[in-house]
């Protein structure tokens, strides 16, 4: 699809990978609706890029529908990028006992259920679009993690949530093929995001050195470039792309 003149939803667009993607889509001429819990930051980014902001808990049906409704009101909704997520760390059995079931459930709810909630509602709206000359009515990108494949110690909940995103990528693409809607997933490796920047500098340096090539942290721009390419390349569908510099995570 051509990005210019289309409307895109970016969840988690107030910071990190989502913010980078929202900015790049806007630079390409897209209108972006940022959906995030960070109101002040989200509104500021939306204003800078000429988009819109909607406060949204992606796992809440009413919140998600409000985002989709806002996007449709601005024009032709053709894209969704799911970047909202959490990454708590807790061992199955740790010093304080068994893993919190509430924390496990919350991680699944935000990361997996939240992604699917946005997908199903955005796809419903896209299915009503007049198709492009290629027959396409929209495309969606979710964010998983390499932890879906080689999760580390303390990542049971996080890995499970991302494994679910990976697992539903193909069946959703098959479900929506008749509607002319594509579905893809990006599984980033170690990226420089607000979450990682909260770690000590020596830890950040060690993580970057562990990436075979290029030996650096990924950037929001790296992610955004791939997201834009996915939107523009109609043959990319039903696949998970690892964006990780060939890293395979060690146990810890």
For every predicted segment, state its role.
Residues 119, 161, 169:
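Active-site helix of classical SDR
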Residues 124, 173-175:
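Alpha-helical segment proximal to the catalytic Tyr-Lys
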Residues 78, 86, 97-119, 140-141, ...:
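Catalytic Tyr-X3-Lys loop
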Residues 87-105, 124, 128-136, 154-157, ...:
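Conserved mid-core segment of classical short-chain dehydrogenase/reductases
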């Amino acid at each position: 699809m051509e990005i210019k003149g289309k409307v895109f939803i970016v969840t988690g667009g107030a910071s990190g990978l989502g913010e980078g993607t929202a900015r790049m889509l806007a630079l390409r001429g897209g209108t972006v609706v940022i959906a995030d819990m960070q109101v002040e930051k989200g509104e500021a980014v939306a204003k800078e890029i000429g988009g819109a902001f909607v406060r949204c808990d992606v796992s809440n049906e009413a919140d998600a529908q409000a985002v989709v409704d806002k996007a449709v009101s601005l024009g032709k909704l053709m894209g969704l990028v799911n970047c909202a997520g959490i990454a708590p760390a807790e061992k199955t059995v740790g010093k304080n006992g068994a893993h919190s079931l509430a924390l496990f459930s919350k991680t699944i709810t935000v990361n997996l259920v939240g992604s699917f909630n946005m997908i199903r509602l955005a796809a419903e709206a896209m299915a009503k679009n007049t198709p492009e000359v290629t027959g396409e009515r929209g495309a969606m990108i979710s964010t998983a993690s390499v932890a879906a494949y080689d999760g580390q110690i303390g990542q049971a909940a996080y890995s499970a949530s991302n494994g679910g995103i990976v697992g539903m990528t193909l069946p959703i693409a098959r479900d929506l093929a008749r509607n002319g809607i594509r579905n893809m997933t990006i599984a980033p490796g170690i990226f420089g995001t607000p979450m990682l920047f909260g770690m000590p500098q020596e830890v950040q340096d060690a993580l970057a050195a562990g990436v075979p090539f290029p030996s650096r942290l990924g950037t929001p721009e790296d992610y955004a470039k791939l997201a834009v390419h996915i939107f523009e390349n109609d043959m990319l569908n039903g696949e998970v792309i690892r964006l990780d510099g060939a890293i395979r995570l060690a146990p810890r």
